[in-house]
C-alpha cells in the first residue's frame, strides 16, 4: 500500500502484515502496490484496513471511534470495553518496558478508561487495583500482571 497525505492528519497503524489508515483531517490517497488502479481517497472519519491479501471496504467511523483513533495526538490512550490483553498491547506501544498479562481469563477482562501516555505506570496501577490483580515489577520496566 502506498499512501499520500496532501495535508491534514492520518493515524497509521502497522501490526505484522496488517495496516490500518484512519483519516483524521484533510484527505488521504491510497494506492495498491498490485497495480495501477485509481487511488482510494479517504475523507475525515474514514478508515481503510489492509493485509497481504488486499484491503477491506472503507469504513466510516463514528465520533467515539474517531476519539479513540485520535487519542494519541492528545497524549492519551483510550479504552472502551477493550480486552485487557489488547489494552496491554496498546500500552506497550508507548511505554518503556513491557506490560505482560498472565492468564487468558485476566486477558479477556475488559477495561474502560482514558490514560495519559506520559503516566502509563499510573494506568497500570489503576488496572491492577480495579481487577485485584497481582503485579510483579522486574528490571527493565517489565510488569507481570496476574
Show the residue positions of the predicted features.
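A residue-level detector for the "anchor" residue at the start of short, highly conserved motifs
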Residues: 1-146
Amino acid at each position: 500500500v502506498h499512501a499520500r497525505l496532501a495535508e491534514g492528519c492520518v493515524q497509521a497503524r502497522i501490526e505484522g502484515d496488517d495496516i490500518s489508515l484512519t483519516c483524521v483531517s484533510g484527505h488521504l490517497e491510497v494506492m495498491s502496490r498490485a497495480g495501477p488502479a485509481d487511488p482510494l481517497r479517504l475523507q475525515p472519519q474514514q478508515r481503510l484496513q489492509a493485509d497481504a491479501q488486499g484491503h477491506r471496504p472503507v469504513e466510516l467511523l463514528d465520533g467515539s471511534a474517531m476519539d479513540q483513533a485520535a487519542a494519541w495526538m492528545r497524549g492519551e490512550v483510550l479504552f472502551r470495553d477493550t480486552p485487557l490483553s489488547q489494552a496491554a498491547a496498546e500500552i506497550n506501544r508507548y511505554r518503556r518496558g513491557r506490560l505482560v498479562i498472565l492468564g487468558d481469563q485476566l486477558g479477556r477482562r475488559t477495561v474502560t478508561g482514558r490514560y495519559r501516555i506520559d503516566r502509563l505506570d499510573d494506568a497500570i496501577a489503576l488496572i491492577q487495583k480495579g481487577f485485584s490483580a497481582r503485579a510483579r515489577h522486574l528490571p527493565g520496566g517489565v510488569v507481570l500482571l496476574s
